């Protein structure tokens, strides 16, 4: 294998070893679902695409048999390291949360979960 390929693989392995993940769950009440889904499509996706420190992300609609009074959505953000995640939380997440609160008030609740991979197979 060429030396540059070996170096590239080593860099990828190092990145995944140090990666840091943030799971943001948005709970929307059933009365605001249509407006929230429009906001996701028109605003949240664009904001996420423009995040410089986010390596990869997954935006999902969460299915649950236990939630009847609304719906959950999840934004899984993958950072190269803990510091980038912490910087995001201190600035961008605060900004996103304030925008959502201003537009939706208590109708959309935000829950953050810090995921610290022990092992991954990405």
What do the PLM-derived regions correspond to, one by one?
Residues 49-55, 78-113:
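An amphipathic, aromatic/His-enriched active-site/gating alpha helix that lines ligand/cofactor pockets
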Residues 32-59, 95-99:
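Short amphipathic alpha-helical segments
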Residues 20-27, 60-92:
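Short, well-ordered beta-strand segments in beta-rich or mixed alpha/beta enzyme
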Residues 30-32, 83, 118-119:
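Residues that cap or initiate secondary-structure elements
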Residues 4-12, 58-71, 98-122:
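Glycine-rich beta-strand-turn "strand-cap" elements at beta-sheet edges
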């Amino acid at each position: 294998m060429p030396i540059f390929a070996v170096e590239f693989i080593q860099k990828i392995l190092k990145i995944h070893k140090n990666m840091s993940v943030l799971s943001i769950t948005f709970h929307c009440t059933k009365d605001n679902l249509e407006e929230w889904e429009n906001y996701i499509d028109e605003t949240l996706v664009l904001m996420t695409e423009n995040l410089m420190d986010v390596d990869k992300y997954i935006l999902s609609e969460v299915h649950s048999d236990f939630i009847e009074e609304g719906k959950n959505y999840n934004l899984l953000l993958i950072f190269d390291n803990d510091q980038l995640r912490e910087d995001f939380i201190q600035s961008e997440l605060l900004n996103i949360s304030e925008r959502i609160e201003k537009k939706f008030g208590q109708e959309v609740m935000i829950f953050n979960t810090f995921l610290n991979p022990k092992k991954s197979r990405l």
